[in-house]
Design a protein with these regions (language model features):
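Catalytic cores of alpha/beta
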Residues: 7-15, 65-66, 93, 113-120, ...
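Short catalytic-loop micro-motif centered on adjacent basic/acidic residues
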Residues: 81-83, 104-106, 157-160
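Alpha-helix-loop-beta-strand connector modules within alpha/beta enzyme cores
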Residues: 36, 40-52, 72-75, 91-102, ...
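C-terminal alpha-helical cap/extension of soluble enzyme domains
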Residues: 149-213
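Glycine-rich phosphate-binding active-site loops on the catalytic face of alpha/beta enzymes
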Residues: 25-28, 108, 122-135, 175-196
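Conserved, mostly hydrophobic/aromatic
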Residues: 24, 82, 116-118, 172, ...
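Active-site beta->alpha loop and helix N-cap motifs at the rims of alpha/beta catalytic domains
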Residues: 2-10, 15-18, 23-100, 128
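Active-site-adjacent beta->alpha loops and helix N-cap segments on the catalytic face
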Residues: 30-41, 59-65, 84-99, 110-119, ...
């Protein structure tokens, strides 16, 4: 789930097989609360599932220190994933953070090449809709990354992000994407279909005089 809103997280966990929660500075800013306050509440809500926290430092050494600081402050363990944008220093930091024994999600990925360089991470997160917005093809990029990882037997998994509609999630799932992270609104829309609603209404009408037990 790509949200830091506690009410949304609680509701989504009632309906979906969610493995964890992803956050970034923009998502966290929507809550108008401090990082420490929001993350502490998320921890209680998700009960040991994956928690992805994005670093904001620019130098590799600072990214490592920031990752360690979050780990120690929130007493995180194997469910903690350090989100690192794939800048030049970010690539360096990915190796450093992995060597320090922490999980890594390489984020802000827009090309197959970026994903391949960052494949030492546990997850790579290509931005589907942002690619579509600049006249690129987000689904094709995800597909290329999946194919490349399979070709070279790379263990890193693809965690697609940045979705505008349900069809994008359908299409990344059909090209073998390992996981997706999406907003509350998108995940809620996945559950619905007007023909399902019509079918249920028809069943209710047809059952009105025959269900007697």
């Amino acid at each position: 789930a790509d949200t830091a809103n506690i009410d949304e997280i609680k509701e989504l966990f009632n309906y979906f097989p969610i493995d964890g929660v992803t956050t970034n500075p923009t998502i966290l800013s929507h809550e108008n609360k401090t990082l420490s306050s929001v993350v502490a509440k998320i921890q209680k809500c998700i009960e040991g599932k994956m928690l992805h926290i994005q670093t904001i430092s620019e130098e590799a050494e600072d990214i490592l220190h920031e990752a360690k600081r979050y780990r120690d402050y929130f007493e995180l363990n194997d469910n903690y994933y350090v989100k690192i944008p794939v800048t030049k220093n970010g690539y360096k930091a990915i190796k450093m953070v992995k060597d320090a024994g922490m999980n890594v999600t390489a984020t802000a990925i827009f090309t197959q090449q970026q994903a391949l360089i960052a494949a030492g991470a546990d997850f790579v997160a290509p931005y589907v809709n942002r690619l579509d917005n600049i006249s690129s093809h987000g689904i094709e990029v995800v597909s290329d990354i999946v194919k490349t990882f399979k070709l070279y037997d790379i263990k890193c998994k693809v965690l697609a992000a940045s979705f505008k509609n349900v069809d994008q999630i359908y299409r990344v799932s059909m090209v073998g994407c390992h996981a997706v992270t999406a907003s509350y609104e998108i995940l809620e829309a996945i559950m619905k279909h007007p023909m399902t609603d019509k079918g249920v209404l028809d069943f209710k009408k047809d059952s009105s005089n025959i269900y007697d037990v």
